[in-house]
């Protein structure tokens, strides 16, 4: 009887890539929560002091952009893990 040998390394590598990409996309959930917090704070702040709405909106957009940049970096890392490595 011959012993069958299986080369499971490509399948293991593909599985590790999928797990790594999934772990990298966890940051997207954190970014979504962060964006929600930014605009929630904007609404509360404008409700307290409507005269500062214009200035607060600028700060909120800056906070949104920085939070979204983190999400885009996480998405970029997930795509790099999936398609490059």
Swiss-Prot record:
PROSITE patterns cross-referenced by the UniProt entry: ATPASE_C
Function, in words: This protein is one of the chains of the nonenzymatic membrane component (F0) of mitochondrial ATPase.
Domain of life of the source: Eukaryota
GO BP annotations listed: proton motive force-driven ATP synthesis
Organism of origin: Arabidopsis thaliana
Keyword Nucleus: no
Topological category with respect to the lipid bilayer: Multi-pass membrane protein
Molecular functions per Gene Ontology: ATP binding; lipid binding; proton transmembrane transporter activity
One GO term describing the cellular component: proton-transporting ATP synthase complex
Similarity field: Belongs to the ATPase C chain family.
Site positions per UniProt: Reversibly protonated during proton transport: 68
Membrane-crossing segments per the record: 19-39, 61-81
Oligomeric form and interacting partners: F-type ATPases have 2 components, CF(1) - the catalytic core - and CF(0) - the membrane proton channel. CF(1) has five subunits: alpha(3), beta(3), gamma(1), delta(1), epsilon(1). CF(0) has three main subunits: a, b and c.
Alphabetically ordered keywords of this record: ATP-binding, CF(0), Hydrogen ion transport, Ion transport, Lipid-binding, Membrane, Mitochondrion, Nucleotide-binding, Transmembrane, Transmembrane helix, Transport
Alphabetical list of SUPFAM superfamilies matching this protein: F1F0 ATP synthase subunit C (SSF81333)
UniProt cross-references to InterPro entries, sorted A to Z: ATP_synth_F0_csu, ATP_synth_F0_csu_DDCD_BS, ATP_synth_F0_csu_sf, ATPase_proteolipid_c-like_dom, F/V-ATP_Csub_sf
Pfam families with a match to the protein in the record: ATP-synt_C
Disulphide-bridged cysteine pairs: none
Entry's localization field: Mitochondrion membrane
Protein name per Swiss-Prot or TrEMBL: ATP synthase subunit 9, mitochondrial
Other information: A stretch of 270 kb of the mitochondrial genome is duplicated within the centromere of chromosome 2 resulting in the duplication of the gene. The expression of this duplicated gene (At2g07671) is not demonstrated. It is also probably not RNA edited and therefore differs in all the positions known to be edited.
């Amino acid at each position: 009887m011959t012993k069958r040998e299986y080369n499971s390394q490509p399948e293991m590598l593909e599985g590790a890539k999928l797990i790594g990409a999934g772990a990298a996309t966890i940051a997207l959930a954190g970014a979504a929560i962060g964006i929600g917090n930014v605009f929630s704070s904007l609404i509360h702040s404008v409700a307290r002091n409507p005269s500062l709405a214009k200035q607060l909106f600028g700060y909120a957009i800056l906070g949104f952009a920085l939070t979204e940049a983190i999400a885009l970096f996480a998405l970029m890392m997930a795509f790099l893990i999936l398609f490059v490595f």
